[in-house]
């Protein structure tokens, strides 16, 4: 099995927002914080990782949701499987993360619907709409 950083290394190099195009990331964990999750089947981690392959090094904020199983329809957001047999997913697309984000911001909303902005940009933006998740 691979470490979380090894999973992130493979995944990040394929992301449109990765600044080191053509280079293999050399990631170092700066911080990893567990956030409370209202989804009993999900752990939410917010990571800061520094990429030493860039000069100067780049810092990335990476929300990750860890699960014991792969939920139906979440294959596109799959990052990898770590040494603890957890399946890692891109938090931006995961209701467990977006709910935890709102909680951290002090914005308690039940079943808040969110989506990731689909336009081309160098980051990932989450848009919160009125109403519950579809």
Regions found by a protein language model. Name each.
Residues 1-130:
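Phosphate/pyrophosphate-binding loops and the adjoining catalytic core of nucleotide-dependent enzymes
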């Amino acid at each position: 099995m691979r470490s979380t950083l090894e999973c992130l290394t493979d995944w990040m190099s394929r992301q449109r927002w990765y600044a080191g195009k053509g280079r293999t990331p050399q990631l170092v964990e700066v911080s990893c914080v567990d956030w409370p999750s209202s989804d009993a089947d999900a752990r939410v981690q917010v990571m800061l990782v520094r990429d030493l392959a860039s000069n100067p090094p780049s810092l990335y904020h990476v929300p990750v949701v860890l699960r014991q199983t792969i939920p139906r329809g979440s294959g596109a957001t799959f990052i990898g499987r770590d040494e603890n047999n957890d399946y890692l997913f891109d938090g931006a697309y995961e209701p467990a993360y977006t709910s935890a984000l709102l909680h951290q911001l002090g914005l308690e909303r039940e079943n808040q619907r969110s989506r990731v902005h689909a336009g081309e940009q160098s980051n990932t933006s989450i848009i919160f709409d009125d109403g519950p998740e579809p």
